């Protein structure tokens, strides 16, 4: 087998492969012999059909199948011989395909980039330091109470934070428009659910009252047919209900799976969950900075094939997340290309750090991570046992731990500055990173 390779770009290779005619004929004859053993042709007993008849009937298809298999087989032999690492499938162009002659074809494909991760010493990390104070727990208790607010009907004028049950009809130029009318809608005044002026226009209204609101849709309204258009809404208030926060009692604590421990026990459970959230938030922000630092210090070119594969994965995820009757390939690729490129680049860089530093997932840390995740459930022992009985899920945890070990490796060389902040600032979501 003859092989020659040409570099047409930094990552693209054009490989010419020549397969000897003898190897082709051997493969064709092998297939014809297999066919002869099972062929059923009128006038001949099974397995006794003359090879000349078999060849006449089946040689063309046998040769085509043999050629296809030989191209696939010799392609992988050639890339191993040339020490190439293909990224994606090749584009194959036959040059010579004649009977009795050598098979020659050209395979064009991309390869993985070869690089060494560097610049770790220049990466700067700001690591947040925070604690969960009593005031933070108090604030969280308020949040939990508000999340479980109940509304009780009252006989008074509506005010902000009240929940109204309303019917409304919207019209533009005297004509009702699609989506502009509803009955029995529950609306909390001040929630910002409706366009500007709608909720404000119902403050002071009482049950049974009808109000007419003349409003204008905002210029950036999602429905372009309605954007910047004046509309008239006739609103009937069916009822007014005021918010009632639940008491901090055993009934409320039971909503969160905490029983018979009183307020002190509930506070302790809330604080434990907040501390876990705090650790995860700080760890996540450090990891994001490490990954951004690796990207900036190691600009690499990546195969288009890998980006395309990642775009397809992101399309599928988007459809699964948002649903609808849309197929993944109907979503424009450009919506996902920047995110896909970033993921691919980071994946290659992280893999190279693992390789350079000979990292393997620390099984002790794997167990610790599983036990921490399990602690959020009512039966943590069962959750831990489930993970260790399910290899795919266990491997996912190992991958996360390995990424953490990559972060630790970078932190050992990077410049790390600790910064004391409040709990709220520490758990606040970080800004989305820029695309690579």
UniProtKB/Swiss-Prot annotation:
Q: Name one GO molecular function term.
A: protein folding chaperone
Signal sequence interval, chain numbering: none
Positions of the PPIase FKBP-type domain: 161-246
Its EC number is 5.2.1.8
Q: Where is it mainly found?
A: cytoplasm
The main enzyme category here is isomerase
Q: Which GO terms describe its biological process?
A: 'de novo' cotranslational protein folding; cell division; chaperone-mediated protein folding; protein transport; protein unfolding
Q: Which UniProt keywords apply?
A: Cell cycle, Cell division, Chaperone, Cytoplasm, Isomerase, Rotamase
Q: Which reaction does it catalyse?
A: [protein]-peptidylproline (omega=180) = [protein]-peptidylproline (omega=0)
User: Looking at the UniProt record for this protein, which Gene Ontology cellular component terms does it annotate, in alphabetical order?
Assistant: cytoplasm
Recorded hits in InterPro entries, A to Z, give:
PPIase_dom_sf, PPIase_FKBP_dom, Trig_fac, Trigger_fac_C, Trigger_fac_C_sf, Trigger_fac_ribosome-bd_bac, Trigger_fac_ribosome-bd_sf, Trigger_fact/SurA_dom_sf
- Pfam families xrefs: FKBP_C (PF00254), Trigger_C (PF05698), Trigger_N (PF05697)
Q: Where in the cell is it found?
A: Cytoplasm
Q: What family is it from?
A: Belongs to the FKBP-type PPIase family. Tig subfamily.
User: What's its job?
Assistant: Involved in protein export. Acts as a chaperone by maintaining the newly synthesized protein in an open conformation. Functions as a peptidyl-prolyl cis-trans isomerase.
Q: Reproduce the free-text note on domains from the UniProt record.
A: Consists of 3 domains; the N-terminus binds the ribosome, the middle domain has PPIase activity, while the C-terminus has intrinsic chaperone activity on its own.
Q: This protein is called what? A: Trigger factor
Please name the taxonomic classification of the source.
Answer: Bacteria, Pseudomonadati, Pseudomonadota, Gammaproteobacteria, Pseudomonadales
């Amino acid at each position: 087998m003859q092989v020659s390779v040409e570099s047409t770009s930094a990552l693209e290779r054009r490989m010419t492969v020549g397969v000897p005619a003898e190897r082709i004929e051997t493969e064709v004859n092998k297939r014809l012999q297999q066919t002869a053993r099972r062929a059923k042709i009128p006038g001949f007993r099974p397995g006794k059909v003359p090879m000349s008849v078999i060849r006449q009937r089946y040689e063309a298809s046998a040769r085509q199948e043999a050629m296809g298999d030989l191209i696939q087989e010799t392609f992988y032999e050639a890339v191993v011989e040339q020490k190439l690492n293909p990224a994606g499938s090749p584009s194959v162009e036959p040059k010579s395909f004649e009977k009795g002659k050598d098979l020659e074809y050209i395979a064009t494909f991309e390869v993985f980039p070869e690089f060494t991760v560097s610049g770790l010493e220049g990466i700067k990390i700001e690591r947040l330091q925070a604690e969960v104070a009593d005031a933070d727990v108090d604030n969280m208790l308020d949040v939990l109470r508000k999340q479980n607010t109940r509304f009780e009907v009252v006989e008074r004028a509506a005010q902000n934070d009240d929940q109204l049950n309303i019917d409304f009809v919207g019209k533009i130029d005297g004509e009702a428009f699609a989506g502009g009318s509803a009955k029995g809608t529950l609306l909390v005044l001040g929630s910002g659910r409706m366009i500007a002026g709608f909720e404000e226009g119902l403050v002071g209204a009482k049950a049974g009252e009808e109000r007419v609101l003349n409003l204008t849709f905002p210029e950036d309204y999602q429905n372009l047919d309605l954007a910047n258009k004046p509309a008239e809404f006739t609103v009937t208030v069916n009822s007014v209900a005021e918010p009632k926060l639940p008491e901090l009692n055993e009934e409320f604590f039971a909503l969160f799976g905490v029983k018979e421990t009183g307020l002190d026990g509930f506070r302790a459970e809330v604080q434990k969950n907040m501390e876990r959230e705090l650790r995860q938030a700080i760890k996540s922000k450090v990891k994001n900075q490490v990954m951004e630092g690796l990207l900036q210090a190691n600009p690499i070119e990546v195969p288009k094939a890998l980006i395309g594969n990642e775009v397809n994965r992101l399309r599928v995820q988007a459809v699964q997340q948002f649903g609808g009757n849309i197929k993944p390939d109907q979503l424009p690729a450009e919506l996902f290309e920047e995110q896909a490129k970033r993921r691919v680049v980071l994946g290659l860089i992280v893999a190279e750090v693992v390789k350079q530093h000979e990292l393997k997932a620390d099984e002790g840390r794997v167990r610790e991570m599983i036990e921490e995740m399990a602690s959020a459930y009512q039966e943590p022992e069962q959750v831990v046992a489930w993970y260790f009985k399910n290899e795919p899920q266990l491997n996912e945890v190992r991958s996360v731990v390995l990424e953490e070990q990559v972060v630790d490796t970078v932190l050992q060389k990077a410049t790390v500055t600790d910064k004391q902040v409040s709990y709220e600032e520490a758990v606040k979501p970080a800004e989305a990173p820029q695309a690579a």
